[in-house]
């Protein structure tokens, strides 16, 4: 039952990616990217539907050639979530997906080609109200910047980004967001900090090629957590060598931990020790699996003993503290004693009842408003 986040977000210009606002006073958007073959329309649509069920706001799709562009058009007709087309090298692919209804173009103006080709892409985006993401990556810096700096640095990333920002602004195009990603946490954080002071456009955060599920989660939580805590960031993507659905889950968990955005259960659980009166780890695993479908933001504390249990339980919407017997707290007050028999079943029932109650209360406030 914690309050609003104390974080003051950086002021930025609001743009729209399809129906999703990005920047300004909009909630921080959670993005992911498909890892299926774009030409396999059925598989890609199925993956996007799973991402949408997990709560994704925006999905990026790689479009490497014209065949993939045509597949993108078919995919776009079959899903509801806004789609970003990831385009490199061939400007004609960007023009084609613009015709097919793309919600955002992710390009690097530096590898699209001559000025007239960049202008053609920008004109197509402007005519159709399509925003652009300038995506700068430490692994693909321009050769002159590599030569100037000797290696990727925060300053090199920012110089590349500003070069592309100026390019779009010369063409009088303002609906864009920017990212300056690196796999090194310190480099990425320093680059975003520098860039945030120099432009007003929304910033898309990410630690690129972060790693597998565990290592990538840790890297992303550290890097993005530092930036988000400073108010920097308008969209996030957790890059994991894992099921893309995990990217969405981790993204929401990072935002929940900073009280920037809530979706579903925020669990507070002890790591357990010999004082526990019930199996905390088993209980948590079962609850997380059973309650994945709940979208209502609730704090649920699961603490195995009476050392910290009552204090944590009193701060949660629903709290369980181990003892003889165990004790359930609801809205900070002792409500029910429980034995270990059917502990998870009863706790699930109470959480679902609380979620339904909160949903009804929120709906009532909206109606009265």
From Swiss-Prot:
Record's cofactor remark: Binds 1 [4Fe-4S] cluster.
MF (Gene Ontology): 4 iron, 4 sulfur cluster binding; 4-hydroxy-3-methylbut-2-en-1-yl diphosphate synthase activity (ferredoxin); 4-hydroxy-3-methylbut-2-enyl-diphosphate synthase activity (flavodoxin); iron ion binding
Pfam families named among the record's database cross-references: GcpE (PF04551)
Annotated catalysed reactions: (2E)-4-hydroxy-3-methylbut-2-enyl diphosphate + oxidized [flavodoxin] + H2O + 2 H(+) = 2-C-methyl-D-erythritol 2,4-cyclic diphosphate + reduced [flavodoxin]
Cofactor: [4Fe-4S] cluster
GO BP terms, alphabetized: isopentenyl diphosphate biosynthetic process, methylerythritol 4-phosphate pathway; terpenoid biosynthetic process
UniProt binding sites for [4Fe-4S] cluster: 270, 273, 305, 312
Pathway(s) annotated for this protein in UniProt: Isoprenoid biosynthesis; isopentenyl diphosphate biosynthesis via DXP pathway; isopentenyl diphosphate from 1-deoxy-D-xylulose 5-phosphate: step 5/6
EC number: 1.17.7.3
The keyword Protein biosynthesis is annotated on this UniProt entry: no
SUPFAM superfamilies, per the entry: Inosine monophosphate dehydrogenase (IMPDH), Nitrite and sulphite reductase 4Fe-4S domain-like
Keyword Metal-binding: yes
Record keywords, A-Z: 4Fe-4S, Iron, Iron-sulfur, Isoprene biosynthesis, Metal-binding, Oxidoreductase
NCBIfam families found in the cross-reference section: ispG_gcpE, PRK00366.1
Functional note: Converts 2C-methyl-D-erythritol 2,4-cyclodiphosphate (ME-2,4cPP) into 1-hydroxy-2-methyl-2-(E)-butenyl 4-diphosphate.
Family stated for the protein in its record: Belongs to the IspG family.
Name this polypeptide is given: 4-hydroxy-3-methylbut-2-en-1-yl diphosphate synthase (flavodoxin)
Organism field: Pseudomonas syringae pv. tomato (strain ATCC BAA-871 / DC3000)
